[in-house]
Amino acid sequence: PGTGSARVDTGEPFLDHMLVTLARYAGLDLDVQARGDLRHHLIEDVGIVVGAAVAALAPATAVRYGDRTIPMDDALVHVSIDVGGRPYYEGPLPSGLYDHWMRSFADHARATLHVRVIRGRDRHHVVEAAFKALGLALRDALAESGAVFSTKGSASVRVEP
């Protein structure tokens, strides 16, 4: 979907770093300019809009699934994602703010997202490994497959007054 370039300015340096990392590993182009009244709201809102952007990008014929495990020094984090339209998040990350970012992202990307911290002492390393793993898993999940990966078919509803 892009080249992995990012222009990010949220006023929150670690969030900026995570978004640049996500863009690079996912191969997505991100341009994020954001400010918030509270740090919590800012991080949540950015998760919401990045998730919504990913939902808009996901083709009906996407592979849908991505699964990556990333080591970063003391940290080892596994991420599995399905961009098939069923929002669900299973964590947690050791940082409540970035755990909430992942939940907000998953809800608005309409993705099932599992983030499993296998080990790690340094919260920075754990969160960064999670964003790297998410990026690589997204790159795989958003790839074009040429077919719709679903056995459910479709349903339609007609409502008359």
Regions found by a protein language model. Name each.
Residues P1-P161:
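Polyanion-binding surfaces on beta-sheet-dominated domains and ring/shell assemblies
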